[in-house]
From Swiss-Prot:
SUPFAM superfamilies: Protein kinase-like (PK-like) (SSF56112). Its cofactor is Mg(2+). GO terms for cellular component: cytoplasm; nucleus. The keyword Phosphoprotein applies. This is Mitogen-activated protein kinase HOG1. It comes from Cryphonectria parasitica (Chestnut blight fungus). CDD domains: STKc_Sty1_Hog1 (cd07856). Residues 20-299 form the Protein kinase domain. It comes from the Eukaryota. It is found in: Cytoplasm; Nucleus.
Length: 358
């Protein structure tokens, strides 16, 4: 049975196995607190994310289960990787991943990025997205703070808690507003992997300019700012809007012409502007794919078609429509954790006590 030690971080109890020491707070998210720590087994620095009260509601339990399944399945150089997972005696879940030191948001707020860094970062983002999308997964919440970077400029996409199956009937607002694709704002109902390409385009623009491209104060203002640059959406896009209120709002806006991005990004080279034009397209089906973006001339210095892998198999989303009680999600979670630790999962419910120190 694992031995647990306790520490207070920002008034929150961190209850971790004795394998980890030197806890330091890194950041606080909506669903958990992240600390850095020293893994005494590997002598490496790691990040430990505490999921707060994962079994308090079926929705939270399912969300945590989804993130765990995704972290186990997605194995790629540009995706954050899971190195350990455990449940504390207080029934909080802890994900342990590699520690990268900083994120793109912090980099962008500290200094302008030079061209070669912008190229290399965008290349790695698109390389990661090619893999994620090939697994049948949409990240949905891509933003600079979810893109981790180390001192060697290695980049990894993190925070897959909101990720969802590729499904033409996806529902709900999810990503941070500045980076949110228009189809999410306009319809709520039909979106796919292309939302990640839009978000990556917004991040690309921010790397080029040093500030957010579409800093909307609210959803109405956000959409208005987008149309000022990209013009009024084409009729075939407008006709996909399911909400009558949204449809009326869009049709009430003044007609605007798309502005050439070269006039906005005067210091960027032609290839950068051309790729950005292909990413920031209203019609999702006309947006460039991650795979095609990697082959674009702008990313030629890094493009290697023999080293841009796709997933070996699609992610299994069969659980995603399930409406289950907390206790069932809990047993499924324990089963996944036992599987991760190469323990026979057939007795997951009986083994629950061992994993929370009972």
């Amino acid at each position: 049975m694992a031995e647990f030690v306790r520490a207070q971080i920002f008034g929150t109890t961190f209850e971790i196995t004795s394998r980890y020491s030197d806890l330091q707070p890194v950041g606080m998210g909506a669903f958990g607190l992240v600390c850095s720590a020293r893994d005494q087994l590997t002598n490496q620095n790691v990040a430990i994310k505490k999921i707060m009260k994962p079994f308090s509601t079926p929705v939270l339990a399912k969300r945590t289960y989804r993130e765990l399944k995704l972290l186990k399945h997605l194995r790629h150089e540009n995706i954050i990787s899971l190195s350990d997972i455990f449940i504390s005696p207080l029934e909080d879940i802890y994900f342990v991943t590699e520690l990268l030191g900083t994120d793109l948001h912090r980099l962008l707020t500290s200094r302008p990025l030079e061209k070669q860094f912008i190229q290399y970062f965008l290349y790695q983002i698109m390389r990661g997205l090619k893999y994620v999308h090939s697994a049948g997964v949409v990240h949905r919440d891509l933003k600079p703070s979810n893109i981790l970077v180390n001192e060697n400029c290695d980049l990894k996409i993190c925070d897959f808690g909101l990720a969802r199956i590729q499904d033409p009937q996806m529902t709900g607002y999810v990503s941070t507003r500045y980076y949110r694709a228009p189809e999410i704002m306009l319809t709520w109902q039909k979106y796919d992997v292309e939302v990640d390409i839009w978000s990556a385009g917004c991040i690309f623009a921010e790397m080029l300019e040093g500030k957010p491209l579409f800093p909307g104060k609210d959803h109405v203002n956000q959409f208005s700012i987008i149309t000022e640059l990209l013009g009024t959406p084409p009729d075939d896009v407008i006709n996909t809007i399911a909400s009558e209120n949204t449809l009326r709002f869009v049709k009430s806006l003044p007609k605007r012409e798309r502005q050439p991005l070269a006039s906005k990004f005067k210091n960027a080279d032609e290839q950068a502007v051309d790729l950005l034009e292909r990413m920031l397209v209203f019609d999702p089906k006309k947006r460039i794919t991650a795979s095609d973006a990697l082959a674009h001339e702008y990313l030629a210095p890094y493009h290697d078609p023999t080293d841009e892998p796709v997933a070996e198999e699609k992610f299994d989303w069969s659980f995603n429509d399930a409406d289950l009680p907390v206790d069932t999600w809990k047993i499924m979670m324990y089963s996944e954790i036992l599987d991760y630790h190469n323990v026979d999962a057939s007795g997951a419910s009986a083994a629950m006590g061992e994993f929370n120190g009972q």
